Each structure stands twice: as structure tokens, then as C-alpha cells.
Amino acid sequence: MAWNTPKVTEIPLGAEINSYVCGEKK
């Protein structure tokens, strides 16, 4: 799972995606 996103938006975007994916898996 590789996301080609700028470092500036990588942290908030990554956190949002992570929480979404975690919620989907659970």
C-alpha cells in the first residue's frame, strides 16, 4: 500500500485513510 502524496498532506491524509481502513477491516 503506497500513497504518492506530498509530505505536507501525507500526515493528515494518511491518518484519515488509516482510520477509515481500520474501521473497514474491523
From Swiss-Prot:
Keyword vocabulary terms for this entry: PQQ biosynthesis
One Gene Ontology term from the biological process aspect of the record: pyrroloquinoline quinone biosynthetic process
InterPro entries to which the protein is assigned, alphabetical: PQQ_synth_PqqA (IPR011725)
Pathway recorded for this protein: Cofactor biosynthesis; pyrroloquinoline quinone biosynthesis
Top-level taxon in the UniProt lineage: Bacteria
Residues in cross-link Pyrroloquinoline quinone (Glu-Tyr): E16-Y20
NCBIfam families tied to this protein: PQQ_syn_pqqA
Family: Belongs to the PqqA family.
Function noted in UniProt: Required for coenzyme pyrroloquinoline quinone (PQQ) biosynthesis. PQQ is probably formed by cross-linking a specific glutamate to a specific tyrosine residue and excising these residues from the peptide.
Protein name (Swiss-Prot/TrEMBL): Coenzyme PQQ synthesis protein A
Gene from which this protein is expressed: pqqA
